[in-house]
Amino acid sequence: MSITPEVKSRGMKFAEEQLLKHGWTQGKGLGRKENGITQALRVTLKQDTYGVGHDPAKEFTNHWWNDLFNKTAANLVVETRQDGVQIRRLSKETTRQDHAKPNLLYQKFVKTATLTSSGEKPDKDWESCSDDDSQEPKPPNVLTDEMLLQACEGRTAHKAARLGITMKAKLARLEAQEQAFLAQLKGQDPGVPQLQSESKSPKKKKKKRKQKEEEEPTTTERSAEKYSEHTDESIRKSKKKKRQHQEERVTDEREGTAIENEEETIRTGGLGELKNREHVDRSFRKKKRRGQHHEERAELAVLDNEGGKVAVSEVGTEEAERRVYTHPCGRSKKRRQHEEEDLNTEDEEVEEALVDSGTREAESRSCSDQKRGRSKKKRRQYQEEEVLDGPGVNTAQKAKKKKQKKRD
C-alpha cells in the first residue's frame, strides 16, 4: 500500500525547521521528558451553526418517545376492584412529593433528635421515614398496550396517524405473516393467508380454478404457435441471407472474369493495333511507289508520241479543251494533287478507325480489310484513267466515262 505524502504548508515547514535546529526528530514528543504531543495542532473550520459542547450523536441516542411513555405511565395508577379495573391519574402535587429534591442540610450527619433545655426530643418525621424504609419495596406498575392507548386517548408515537395516514396495509401483511408462521408451527400448509374482511366464498374459488385450468392449454397452444412462427421466420431469413451471399459471389466472379478479359483484350489489342498500323503503312508506301511509276511511264509515252510540242496557232474552244485535257503536264499535275488528297484522306480515315477500334482485334481486322478493298478499287480506277489518257482514246469516250462515274 503506497501512502501518499502529506502536503505541508509554509508555516508547518518553518516550524519543523526550527525544531530540527534544537535537536528534535520526528516521532518524539515535546518537552524535557519528551512526553508531549508528537503531531502539530491543526486548525479546522466549523461548518455548522451548533454551539460549543454540542453532541452530534444525541439525535440518534435520545429516545424521546420512550421517555414520554415512561412519564405518562408514572402518572397513571391502576386499581383492581370487585367491579373491575380502574385507572386513576395522579395529580401534579403528588408527583412532586414522590420526586422531591433531597434536603442537603444534613448531608453527612444523621439527625435523630433535637437538643432542648429539658433534653433531647426525637424527630417524628425520621421515625416515619425509618418505618417506611423497613417495609418491602413495592413492585413497579406495568401497563399494557390497551391501558396506554386509553391513557393517551388513542394517540401513538406515529405522528402521521394524527393526519389520517395509517399503516393498514403493513399491519395486514404482518398479521398474514403471523398466521402463516402459526400454521407452519402447527404442521399445516401455510397457503395464502387471508384476512376475515377479505374472505371469499368457496364457489368463487372453484370458478377461478376452472378458469385457470381452461386457460393453461390455450396459453400453451399460443406459445407453441408463436414459437413455430418465430422458427419459420428465422429459417426464411437465413435462406434469404444465403441466397444473397451466393448472388453476390456470382456477380463478383463475373466482374472479375470480365475485368481479366478486358485486360487481356487491351494487351492483345495493343499488339494488334501496332501490327495493323505497320501493315497499313507498308500498303500506302507501296501504293505511292506504284502511282509514281505509272505517272512516269505515262509521261514518257506521251512525250514519245507527240514529241513534247503543242500547236499554238490553232484557236477555238474545242481545241483548247482538248489541249488542256490531252496535255501531259496538266494531266500529271492534277493527278498528283488528286492522289495526294486521296492518300491524306485515307490516312486520316485509317487513324480514326484505329482509334475508334479500341481494344478489340476483330474490329481492327475488319476495318483494315475494308480499307484494303477501297484501296484496290482506287488502284483500278487510276489504271483505267491511265488507259483512257493514252493516245488511242477519243475525248468523247473519256467525257462519257467521267459522266458515268459521277452518276455512280
From Swiss-Prot:
Highest taxon of source: Eukaryota
Keyword Calcium: no
Positions with biased composition (Basic residues): 398-408
Residue ranges, compositional bias (Acidic residues): 340-354
Residues where Phosphoserine is found: S128, S130
This protein's UniProt keywords: Acetylation, Isopeptide bond, Phosphoprotein, Ubl conjugation
InterPro entries documented for this protein: G_patch_dom (IPR000467), PINX1 (IPR050656)
Keyword field contains Phosphoprotein: yes
Biased composition (Basic and acidic residues): 222-236, 245-257, 274-283, 358-372
N-acetylmethionine sites (modified residues): M1
Cellular component GO terms, alphabetical: nucleolus
Pfam family, one: G-patch
Cross-link (Glycyl lysine isopeptide (Lys-Gly) (interchain with G-Cter in SUMO2)): K46
Modified residues (Phosphothreonine): T4, T116
Domain G-patch: 11-57
Record GO terms (molecular function): nucleic acid binding
Chain intervals for the UniProt region annotation (Disordered): 116-141, 187-408
Name of this chain's protein: G patch domain-containing protein 4
Gene this chain is encoded by: GPATCH4
